[in-house]
Amino acid sequence: MIQVESTLQVADNSGAKKVACIKVLGGSHRRYASVGDIVVVSVKEAIPHSKVKKGDVMKAVIVRTAKEVRRMDGSYIKFDGNAAVLLSTQGEPIGTRIFGPVARELRAMNFMKIISLAPEVL
């Protein structure tokens, strides 16, 4: 459950380490984002000489949330923390590697590139 000013870990090798949500996309007054939703983020922490710099504003897709997500079969899944993958303007991931597991819900949102790069899909 991500809202404005939530901080997230970055689960790819784009160079950003931490980002902060500045807008939840989808609806005029949408308050929360969950796994598979797209948010606008600002880079708060980045490693030097990387693809992204501190202060960059870009889109990201949520891949893990600490708040549990209910599945159609009635089961729930939750992770230890909140994480996102940075997206280019075309909607493709900026990084070439994904770190940590990602939720299966991304497959339904057609983020196949992220699913194929992830080491584990839960």
Swiss-Prot record:
Keywords: Ribonucleoprotein, Ribosomal protein, RNA-binding, rRNA-binding. One of its GO terms (molecular function) is large ribosomal subunit rRNA binding. The keyword Ribonucleoprotein applies. SMART domains: Ribosomal_L14. GO terms for cellular component: cytosolic large ribosomal subunit. One of its GO terms (biological process) is translation. It holds the Pfam family Ribosomal_L14. Belongs to the universal ribosomal protein uL14 family. NCBIfam families: rplN_bact (TIGR01067). Binds to 23S rRNA. Forms part of two intersubunit bridges in the 70S ribosome. Part of the 50S ribosomal subunit. Forms a cluster with proteins L3 and L19. In the 70S ribosome, L14 and L19 interact and together make contacts with the 16S rRNA in bridges B5 and B8. This is Large ribosomal subunit protein uL14. The lineage of its organism: Bacteria, Pseudomonadati, Thermodesulfobacteriota, Desulfovibrionia, Desulfovibrionales. The gene is rplN.
